[in-house]
């Protein structure tokens, strides 16, 4: 078998924007930041919530506003 072909595995802490932290094994690094996790995602919480943190809806409306004029 070949030696040293497997990625390094870290004990990582995943930190959500809501403040929730989870300890997992990861090959990405020791600290991973995410915007949404199971503690705050509407599917897991059962609560309807607006999740546009990156301004995607505003960008879409601005881009296609010229077609709405007609």
UniProtKB/Swiss-Prot annotation:
Any GO CC annotation of this UniProt entry: ribonucleoprotein complex
Cofactor(s) demanded: Zn(2+)
GO molecular function, one term: rRNA binding
Gene3D superfamilies: Ribosomal protein L31
Biological process (GO), any one: translation
Entry superkingdom: Bacteria
Keywords tagged on the record: Metal-binding, Ribonucleoprotein, Ribosomal protein, RNA-binding, rRNA-binding, Zinc
Assembly, per entry: Part of the 50S ribosomal subunit.
NCBIfam families documented for this protein: L31 (TIGR00105), PRK00019.1 (NF000612), PRK00528.1 (NF001809)
HAMAP family found in the cross-reference section: Ribosomal_bL31_1
Job description of the protein: Binds the 23S rRNA.
Protein name: Large ribosomal subunit protein bL31
Organism: Desulfovibrio desulfuricans (strain ATCC 27774 / DSM 6949 / MB)
Gene of this entry: rpmE
């Amino acid at each position: 078998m070949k030696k040293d072909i497997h990625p390094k595995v870290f004990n990582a802490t995943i930190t959500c924007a809501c403040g929730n932290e989870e300890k997992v094994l990861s090959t990405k690094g020791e600290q991973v930041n995410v915007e949404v996790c199971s503690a705050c995602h509407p599917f897991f919480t059962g609560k309807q919530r607006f999740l546009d943190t990156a301004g995607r809806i505003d960008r879409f409306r601005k881009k296609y506003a010229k077609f709405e004029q007609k």
